[in-house]
Amino acid sequence: MKKILFSFLATVVLVSCGDKGDDNVDYQTNRLVKKVTSKNKNGNLEEVITFTFQGGRPISQHSSYYKDGVQTGTTQVTTIHYEGNLVKTENAGRKNFEENNYFYENGKLSRSTEKRERNDYTTTYEYSYTNNQVTTVLKSYPTTIYLKSGGTQSGTRYTERQFTHNGNTVIEVKTGYEKDLNGVVVTNTVSSNGTQTITYTLSGGNVVKKVEETEYSTTTREYTYDTKHNPRYEMIGIFNPDPTKTLEAYNGKNNVIKEKYNYTEKSGSRKIVFIYTNEHTYNADGYPTIVKLYTEENGTREFRGTTEYEY
């Protein structure tokens, strides 16, 4: 459903978890996106997303996908249910077979579950906080554990994200592991359970740098922003209220106009550098109406497509 739910937003941000969950939230409909149209470099439609609003907030989303300008499949409908002004449930897919549920404590997201058409299980996310900042997100789902000996056993797969906040820096450590049905960690598996460390540098409500370190590689992303309104930021708290979404650069206060990507393997065998550039056209209120995407690699700049916003 993350693909279905406003995919161009990559879901939504909570800048200060809990603040946007107040029942007195006043949604300013004129600032929220009503329609998003994506086209490829040839001008052919790729995706059209429209929203239905009630009481100043979206209650449904219609998503249509295209190949060479021709729609593929039927329009997908997502329905959003609220408890007060907090998102409680999102249903989508055939016979609402895809579903997200959200649970809160003191206005903060404490747990969420997701069910997908392609999976026969439910994935659970659990959230912990210190001083109103998210410190741990634990993802879990049932799985078959494949042992190095060649055997298998039933168990649970976990991905744990731990966050340390220090001024304008956030450090995330991500680890994966598996437990048997008795809750004991299984070590002799064929799964890759390495540790990934991600360092975020923040400035003015935006992520300006992101460095990902693994055992084998380093990936650095550096972001440059405009000073205008980001429509993604304006959708705060309406869809997926996951507080970690504030660490996604394209969910920041302003719009990304340049992203420099640098991937280096620690063995020295490979290095990749390229640049994304976004050129914006704005309305009178300072919101983007058209965004043109370009990529640049080895000195060659290429137009990739456009995204159009209607408010």
What are these regions (language model features)?
Residues 2-7:
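Sec-dependent signal peptide recognition
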Residues 15-16:
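C-terminal motif of bacterial Sec signal peptides marking the signal peptidase cleavage site
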Residues 11-12:
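Repetitive helical segments and hydrophobic/amphipathic motifs
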Residues 19-311:
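Buried hydrophobic residues that stabilize the cores of well-folded domains
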